[in-house]
Regions:
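Short linear motifs centered on Gly/Pro in flexible linkers and helix caps
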Residues: 1, 21-22
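Bacterial N-terminal signal peptides that target proteins for export
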Residues: 1-10
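Bacterial N-terminal signal peptides
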Residues: 9-20
Length: 462
């Protein structure tokens, strides 16, 4: 009878190297990615600018995409990140999409984040900016919007399903860079921007951070997730486009073949890419942003251990004094067609037996990655004051590194979210835009403290 003998050399190898191999495997995440094109397949109306009316897009400058990244840590805890080259989606559509994903993949609400780039060169999605768009549409355009919204829902769900099918061992790392084209549009006159920038006299506040998350599989770049706090409003024509963010994603995918580049919009509700209105500028800003991301990738980055925590809360943020039915009746005769449309819609709501709510259920989501990155997802068009406050109070920030990430336009784009300062100053972000979103009045002065108190609670509960 022969016996297999274990050589002394193998024993030395096993004792020396196997523990480290097991440890290395413990340091890996499982990640999956997928992309689905969501460019409308037929001409339809475009979102974001009332001046476009019901005129349809005529061509495609660059395609629009839904993209998904699945993160799974060493304890099999999962998170689903979806990015969309769209202006935004509303609460109802977001809930429907999340419900389907939760049921199919056994997730809870905290594990799904849906982030819109806020491009103003995408299609109108049902439920968003109704007094600006849908309340004025003819039947044909309204049906196109409803059909596209169902197509979008299915596309997102398909994208998530496909990403789950590609889960594989991955390493995660992160860093942060800077890009400087975002400009505070409230405190700088657009025509003076070139001169102010050249003289170093642009007024703030602003947030020029570019957070970057890198996913590698077998040493190859699989996904790049990055954010920036600036409106996607370089373009205002009639071609589908992801604007500067779309160009940035395309350039990164060319630089790193085989990877999926995903953009999320930060707290740039009061930030514009200036100057603008030329395709050349959208390409230039996209290249500027892609270069900032690639510098992070090629520089010093930080590995993330496979630890994931997720939480989600909806907090009631208060409106100011609600209008009476008589006041709405008067507004319904306004020469401002958008104010009149909002008033008629709210009157219909009241007459159907649904009183105007004094609050709105505002979504706040928190992910912690590797016990290093504190990542907040806020709904609506959030002004920059929020990001600066959250980073100041909850992060370790210096000139080269930002470990607190603040995504806006996430899960529900219901309105502008002004800070108390901006609310009291007034103007478009301070309250004027509420008309276009169909909400009954401006926010109460407690809006900022309510949101930031909840942010504080979520980070302290982890």
């Amino acid at each position: 009878v022969s016996r297999n003998k274990i050589s002394p050399t193998f024993l030395v190898f096993a004792i020396t190297f196997l523990p480290s191999l097991v440890a290395a495997n413990d340091e890996l995440w499982n990640c999956g990615t997928a992309t689905v094109c969501i460019t409308p397949q037929q001409p339809m109306t475009m979102a974001g600018y009332a001046s476009r009316g019901e005129k349809h897009a005529t061509d495609t400058l660059n395609d629009l995409w839904a993209k998904t990244l699945i993160l799974e840590d060493a304890s099999n805890r999962r998170a689903v990140l979806v990015t969309l080259d769209l202006l935004g989606i509303d609460r109802k559509l977001s809930q429907r999409i999340c419900k389907s994903i939760m049921e199919k993949h056994g997730l809870d609400r905290s594990q799904i984040a849906i982030c819109s780039s806020h491009t103003h060169s995408g299609p109108v999605v049902a439920g968003t900016l109704r007094p600006m768009h849908a309340l004025h549409f003819n039947e044909s355009n309204l049906n196109l919007t409803l059909e596209y919204s169902e197509f979008l829902k299915q596309s997102i769900e398909d994208c998530v399903d496909q990403a789950f099918e590609t889960l594989a061992p991955s390493s995660l790392s992160w860093g942060s860079g800077s890009a400087t084209f975002a400009t505070n549009r409230r405190n700088n006159t657009e025509k003076n921007i070139p001169k102010l920038r050249a003289s170093g006299k642009l007024a703030g506040p602003y947030d020029h951070d570019v957070p970057v998350l890198m996913v590698r599989q077998d040493g190859k770049m699989k996904a790049i997730v990055f954010g920036y706090a600036c409106h996607c409003t370089v373009l205002s024509g009639f071609e589908w486009s992801g604007d500067y963010a779309g160009f940035a994603q395309s350039e990164l995918e060319d630089l790193y073949p085989g990877c999926v580049a995903m953009f999320w919009a930060g707290c740039g509700g009061d930030q514009n890419p200036l100057p603008r209105r030329k395709v050349e500028l959208a390409r230039r800003y996209g290249s500027h942003l892609a270069h900032a991301v690639s510098q992070v990738i090629e520089g010093s980055t930080h590995d993330l251990s496979p630890e994931l925590q997720t939480s989600y809360r909806e907090v009631d943020i208060a409106f100011g004094t609600l209008p009476t039915r008589d006041e709405l009746q008067a507004q319904s005769a306004s020469q401002n067609r958008y104010e009149a449309a909002r008033a008629r819609s709210l009157i219909e709501q009241i007459d159907s037996g649904q009183e105007l709510s004094p609050t709105y259920p505002y979504p706040i989501q928190f992910w912690n990655l590797g016990d290093e990155i504190n990542w907040f997802f806020l709904g609506g068009e959030v002004v920059v004051d929020y990001a600066l406050s959250i980073k100041s109070n909850h992060g370790e920030t210096n000139a080269d590194l930002t470990d607190v990430w603040c995504t806006a336009y996430a899960n529900d784009v219901m309105a502008y979210i002004p800070s108390r300062r901006v609310l009291l100053e007034g103007g478009y972000e301070g309250g004027g835009a509420m008309i276009y979103y169909g909400l009954p009045t401006i926010w109460d002065e407690t809006v900022e403290s309510t949101i930031l108190d909840t942010v504080h609670q979520l980070i302290n509960e982890r």
